Each structure stands twice: as structure tokens, then as C-alpha cells.
Amino acid sequence: MESQERTAVFAELEREFVQAGGTAWPYLHDHFARFAATKREFDRTRTTGAGALLDIGAHWLHQSVLWAMDGWNAIAVDLPVTFEIACVRDIAARHAIRLLSNTNLEKPGALATLPGDSIDAVLFTEIIEHITFNPISLWREIHRILRPTGCLIVTTPNYYALRGRAWSPLRFATGRGGGLSTQSLLGEPTFSHHWKEYSRAELESYFAELSADFRVDKALHMPEYRPERFTSAIGKSVMAIETMIPGLRPNLHFEIGLRDKRHGVIAEPRW
């Protein structure tokens, strides 16, 4: 999706949400570049037509609508409180998006209502870093409903990004630990935290340990989605470094297929 095309698609998407009564506009404006980049990368190597899409953590349906506009039959999963919003229900009705409410993804009861082998693509974008529970039950359901020819699309921050969490020399030097800061832990609601950020190698291992059926087809370090924000000399230098050294780029884009469905999700939580 080149710049001119991306602008046209955004304008069309914006019109759709205006007609539906609005949306979370700041979130859409901040994240559309990511939505577009994710779909562009998926489309770049896609060999089949549009099919059934499952958008997990769909929020205000921005990605669900974007894909529905391209012919996908979207099913969206999110918290009940989100799907009670009138404009969310309106835009869902306009695009025949099925809404599945699920309060706790550790117990993915909403996914149990979907037939096996019924989904062609699963969007799991900017979700995995927020998970606070053992996800085995969730992945078992995703494995069950994803067709053998389907694709799981995962995007998440890169732990080793140049501007990322791995590089905290001041915290290390002052004995203030790593990971979440205490200010973030205590001062923000549960679902806003990045409880666990991953490196590319970690995510490759993650899906290998889940099931021998999962096949990592793409494992990419993605550049900054909105480079136009970095206009200072320092900002431009950061962009140049990230361009030259892919491992320091801020984002990961994974596409995971299924070799077959002989093994299932073999990981088993235990004390």
C-alpha cells in the first residue's frame, strides 16, 4: 500500500466510521500506519483470495473494517464493554462483522462457538505483549479453528529495538531492575502494560514449543510505522540506524502457517 493509496484507503475508512457515528479517532490516527503495513506485508505474498478473518483484540474494529472492505468476512473478538458501544455495533452491522464478546482470553469460550477449520486468517496484532495468563487454552482454540491452509498474523514490539526495553543502562546502574517500572505497574490499568516483550528468536521458539504443526513462514523486523514523526537530527539518525541494522527495528511481524494438524498444541502447563 503506497503512500497515495494508503491516504485514499484511510479516507475511505474514515468515512465509514463517520457514517457509523464515530470511533476512537486518536487511536485510529495513531495506529492506521501499522494496520496498513501489516495488511500490505500479508498481501505481498498471499496466494489465495479473501476468506474468513478472526480479529482477536479487535478494539473498535479498525482492522476488521479495513479487511472487510477488501472482501474478508470478519469475526471480531473483544471485551463485552467494547461491543456495547453504539458506533461499534453500527459499523459491525454495516460490514457484516460478527461480534464475539470474551471477558477473559485465558478462557476463550467465544472461540469455542466457531467450527473447526473455519478460519483463513487470524489477526493477533499488538496483543501477545499484553497477555497476563498462561495462553495454552487460547492457542488450542486458535489451532482448532484455523484451516491447515490458514495464516496466523502476529505483530508485537521488538524487545531488542534500538528504542526498546532491553537497553536500560541507567536502571541497571542504579539497581532499579528491568522490565515494567513500578510506576507503570501501579499507575496503569492491567491491559495497558507490555507484560512481556519478545525478540524474534523468542517468538520463533514460542510457536515451535506450542506445536510441531505451526510453521513460521515470516519472521520480520519491521521499520518504524510513522517515520515522518522523526524530524529532528537525532530522530533522523535513529531512523538511519534502524534502517541499516534490522535487528534494532521497533516492530516484529510474524506469519505462522500450519504444516498439518496431526500434533495439536502439545505444551502443557504444570506446577
PLM features: what roles do these ranges have?
Residues 49-59:
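Conserved class I S-adenosyl-L-methionine
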Residues 2-33, 79, 90-95, 101-110, ...:
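S-adenosyl-L-methionine-dependent methyltransferase catalytic module, highlighting the catalytic core
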Residues 73-78:
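Conserved SAM-binding motif I beta-strand of class I
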Residues 81-83:
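Helix N-cap at the beta1-alpha1 junction of Rossmann-like dinucleotide-binding domains, i.e.
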Residues 121-133:
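A short SAM/SAH-binding and catalytic strip from SAM-dependent methyltransferases
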Residues 60-72:
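Conserved SAM-binding loop of SAM-dependent methyltransferases across substrates and taxa
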Residues 109-122:
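A short acidic, Gly/Pro-enriched loop at the edge of an enzyme's catalytic core
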